């Protein structure tokens, strides 16, 4: 099947020429192209049409889960009949194992897995290996972290057909080899069960389960059914079952990996003994032998990713396999909000290296654990085929890659203009802001306010609430799905003002927002440079009455550049509208998400603690306990993000104690 855009709109404004130039560039073999598209100009729609023109499997790379979720929802609407997949980190919370040499404390890995996101990741790899060409994957930078070898993954794909001669025992053996677990009670994704001559399989990546009827050693019938109601949905002549886990491997490879691990273990233990580190030698021997026993029995162990180099058959120091290895060689990469995403990819590799070095140095892991890592930037570049960078404010890197040439998309299909920018003094800025908010509320419009610090955002939210303004503030500790919910509540009018620090910039699609207020706009720095100001002001560009107020006592270079560029674009847009007799039209965009249909279930790994709880919590109501757990969870996630592993571990233990008290 080919990519086919489904939309009630046709390309307008600058979109037709942008689509034509970018598509022609891909066909002509241009390796790098840049789309400079202003906020609200329909860059996603342009990209969708380019994909339709070139018919290439496509990876759309976003710099965070919120933006990835929004792009996924939009592309699902544009391509309802094609394979649109979502690939982000499946951890709601992740604390890696770590050793603190100063205190001698080792902290075990702890995590909270989002089962729905895990299913979507497996759906992505399964679709990519299915051979279909009409596949578009929206991914965060987590797609550059190591996953299983695509060759091994493909080897463990099970293909069956009606009337095929195959023993039931052989099929069951293949399912176990593909890491499906047999069950009799809970029929969950990644399991199979046997009922007489029938085998039922619930793939890890699918919404429905499959029932395979045998007559002797022949498959009589294959059908899909609803796992909850057992109602038959569809019958098949053929069926492909993909592995239940990305780290699947064949018995031969597993045996070879076990032998290599044993050899490296002997070498590392001997090395530790030679330099007098007997404790480290004993520790490494015990931990690795325990893991090896698990691998022999089950085919995997906790922390098996630390042995991925052996399972992948890679040499020391070579890069891990990642999602990009699953794409065909002619795939197209689209880097959204490239001025942020590219720099994020740059910083990934160095993030966990020192932590891994400690684990190896003190005998918690073999040196091969160092090769379980994200891609280095040069490795990321080497895997690219053709790239389109998309941004309203492309950075020097993208412009250099595309030889300083970019495709401009300034005229919006709706005829909407860039926001009017006003600079006002910071004296009495809050009173002035409240007056502006009241005007917008009367018109049923929304307001975004951006501050310099989280504390300022909190204090402002408290004050505005006190004077009767319905507001919320958003910050980095709010998890992905809650963030999406907050954005939807703002659009629905459940509250009128959203306050934030650095989260109200790239890619947020909020047509109801007519005013963006930037406090302390003259404080030069990362949050108030030219690109940040342009992106933040752009949040009001999707509204007919779009306006931005910069509260400042002096005119900085960044402010002046932003104002000049905005005025240039605004003049060009007005002239185009006048020449073509266009009246700007408000955007009427549906308020929905591809995620609202699937409630997400959280699964936690951990052990039960028998330590007594803090005395005061024993008298708390269920509501208060749940509130305290939520607060501690946010603090734990923050500590883990800041690599304060000891604090994160303490908070994790506190949460487990509190959860035991819930009625």
Task: State each model region's role.
Residues 1-2, 439, 575-650, 655-663:
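Acidic, low-complexity intrinsically disordered tails
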Residues 1-599, 638:
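ASCE RecA-like P-loop NTPase motor cores
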